[in-house]
């Protein structure tokens, strides 16, 4: 479906779209507030500055899509492929991502108060400066992610991974990391976990990096 067709549908009051292909389309600045997209494709599409507040995305594929400067407050994404999507300067307050693939996604300078990720792949994602303070993080794979300056204070990790993530200046005081994989964390970064709760196995892994034998 091309932009003009979508605009016609919206003008007629249509707010639900199923099995539509918007690949490579320029959908920038469209008002899609409250729309529902189910099993639609948006590969490499541009939604620059689109209004997506309260929209619902179900099992959509939007690899490489540009969501820069969108207003997606209270939007919900369920089971979507959003690999390598770009969200720079977007408004994502109270948005929810459940069961989504966000490998390589970029979240630079986003407004994210109350955002929720659950059972998501965030491998290699750029989440620098995000606050997850006091959040319960369920099955989030942050492997190789850019987490510099993130605030994980008092967060609880239920599964998931921080394997080989970039953690410079991240804060973990009071965080419960026992459920997460922290393999690959460099010893020089171990101080970041001061005040965090880790398991005996995780502590032993740190000691092995010092070439100490744990018995």
Cite the ranges covered by each PLM segment.
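Tandem repeat scaffolds
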Residues: 1-215
């Amino acid at each position: 479906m091309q932009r003009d067709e979508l605009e016609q549908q919206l003008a007629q009051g249509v707010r639900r779209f199923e099995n539509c292909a918007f690949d490579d389309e320029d959908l920038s600045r469209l008002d899609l507030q409250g729309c529902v997209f189910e099993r639609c494709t948006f590969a490499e599409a541009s939604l620059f500055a689109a209004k997506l507040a309260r929209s619902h995305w179900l099992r959509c594929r939007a690899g490489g899509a540009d969501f820069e400067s969108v207003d997606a407050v209270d939007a919900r994404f369920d089971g979507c492929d959003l690999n390598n999507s770009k969200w720079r300067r977007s408004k994502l307050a109270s948005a929810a991502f459940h069961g989504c693939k966000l490998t390589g996604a970029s979240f630079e300078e986003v407004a994210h108060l109350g955002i929720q990720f659950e059972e998501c792949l965030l491998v290699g994602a750029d989440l620098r400066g995000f606050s997850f303070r006091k959040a319960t993080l369920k099955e989030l794979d942050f492997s190789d992610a850019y987490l510099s300056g993130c605030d994980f204070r008092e967060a609880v990790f239920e599964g998931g991974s921080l394997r080989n993530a970039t953690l410079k200046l991240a804060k973990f005081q009071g965080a419960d990391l026992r459920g997460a994989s922290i393999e690959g964390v460099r010893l020089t970064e171990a101080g970041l976990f001061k005040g965090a709760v880790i398991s005996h196995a995780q502590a032993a892994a740190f000691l092995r990096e010092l070439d100490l034998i744990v018995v």
